[in-house]
Amino acid sequence: MLKKKEEQTTGKNIGKNMCKIEQKLQRKHLIALSFFLPLLVMAGCCIVFGVQPFGDNSLLIIDGLHQYMPFYSVLYDKLKGGETLFYSFRSGLGINFLSLFSYYLSSPFNLLILFFKKSQLNMAVSMIIVLKIACSGMTAGIYFSSKSKKQGFSTVMISMAYALSSYMVGYCWNVMWLDAIMIFPIVVMGLERLIDKKDGKLYCLALFYALYCNYYIAFMICIFAIIWYIFYSFKSVKQFFFRGISFALYSFLAAGMAAVLLIPAYLGIKQTASGEAMTLPDHSFLTNAADLLNRQFAMGRPISHDNFDGNANLYIGIFTVLAVG
């Protein structure tokens, strides 16, 4: 009898372990698809529209061509020649290059330009954009697959919707913003882990990466994190306040680690004309609800990047609107 019970127990344990292994494999496959499908979509778009290396066009427009590319050219020379990142004599009598680096060029993805010739920088940056979009799908897949035990292709579809959103299409030429968008799902995942499991390491590292790569978008992520924390479902008031202390400490720790670039960036901004009078701007609505709703329909125009009206690229699709309704 004892042997039979032991055999049954062993069989159940093996069955449970096999289920766990299958779930892990399935999750890995979904995450991989969340990376490769946006990558294939972007590669297809590059082929159709003749973006380098499949033609002479570029994913960069406006400031991307006239401002960012010269910055990448200087960075390329500095990395290849072993020059300092603190200063550059390429502009006038010289400029504080570190403050410029902290906003435009601090992404680790930019090291990939070293694998290209200087004449291929435009192609290199376009490929970096495609890679960041694909990685955004992957990080979204990691987050969404962690939210449910039942893994399905819907996880991949939602991740693709995030990676190929209207925001990405409209602003992908602002290549320095994409790192923060890419790491955003991990920031949220880390924040939830901090609240539920008292483990703030992932949140701290993810927020540090966002602050290090681009403080502009990271500032918006910080605002979102505060709002997300306030409206999160806590078990008790005690948990809300005690986790709040941890939330604040890990947030300050992330900012402290990123201070190596945040402080030079702040000092650099203070020396500019816009930094002399740092006051809150006037607020006004740039669009109306009817126009925003109209953008959600098929055959509409959800993307606005050929003018400077300041309208936000907010597109979630009519199916989402109907689901919310």
What are these regions (language model features)?
Residues 4-5, 16-19, 23-25, 147-150, ...:
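Membrane-interface junctions at the ends of membrane-embedded or membrane-associated helices
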Residues 48-148, 153-185, 209-213, 301-307:
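Active-site lumenal/periplasmic loops and adjacent helix-entry segments of GT-C-fold
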Residues 29-64, 70, 250-265:
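Transmembrane signal-anchor helices characteristic of membrane glycosylation enzymes that use polyprenol
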Residues 27, 31, 118-128, 187, ...:
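Membrane-interface helix-boundary signature
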